[in-house]
């Protein structure tokens, strides 16, 4: 047999997916496991969205659409971006995708040539570097640890840029850290992006989950609209993770290329999911406000329950994750003698001994921390925190 694709075989599997799958299998096997691994809201898809999908099915709207998506849906996305974000797009610049992850792939595929560098602030979402490598690019990590509030600045970006730099991949609000760039911080970054003449892929999927500041899109600043691809979707904001629907909003020449890519790949996202997204765009924000309130309360609870750590976690400004520093406990042993050498050992021992699944920071490029998702019920958060505290206090 001839060999398989080297490029594809070199892609690392998603550690967040692997941990979530492991936890679900343990639960299926009858084990007592609490999982705070997956970034998935624990609320149901709102009724208006369900009804929009049902009505589309009953009306026979189940055939092929244009590769870039249904025109009415793209018009509604453009309207949302205008009214909520101050961004000006024609419907032809919107490409509906099978989730925001697919939108990130489209953006990178449109931009990257072999040997191009893509700057990725670290910690980062696990998928970013793997997609860059898959497409022949080189991920260049710019460290932004807890001492920098998990954010890079214009000087960091300037130092990282070389003639090979094609783009920066910015996640704001950030998974896994919950960091949110203020308008002034983002404006300073935008000026440097323009000065360096690079592209910006701005993943804004957590835009509605901001606690302490106003959300600002990277594309709003002077010189940015023509070089920014905005990524967004409905999985987090409208509890539609399984529907797989998102979008790229791009400058016209890039949008045209993305349309070609999609036409030869998936053709288009699910017809029914697009109509469900239209229902989401047309409904009020009451569900979003309810989730914001719930996540704000859970954030406070998680900060209180993890305050015993030697290094206290930084309060997340957005999203629904707590990125907790645990490196103070590396080198210690579990009661059965296992040495905790890093975040992977920490999380493995925690799952094995206490039945709590969280994600090691190593998956996100920061081995000093672990990630909790607080998109879970109050009961499960309490159980998780009890188990986490017991585990840490048993380390010797």
Task: Show which residues each predicted segment covers.
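PLP-dependent class I/II
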Residues: 4, 8-14, 19-22, 26-32, ...
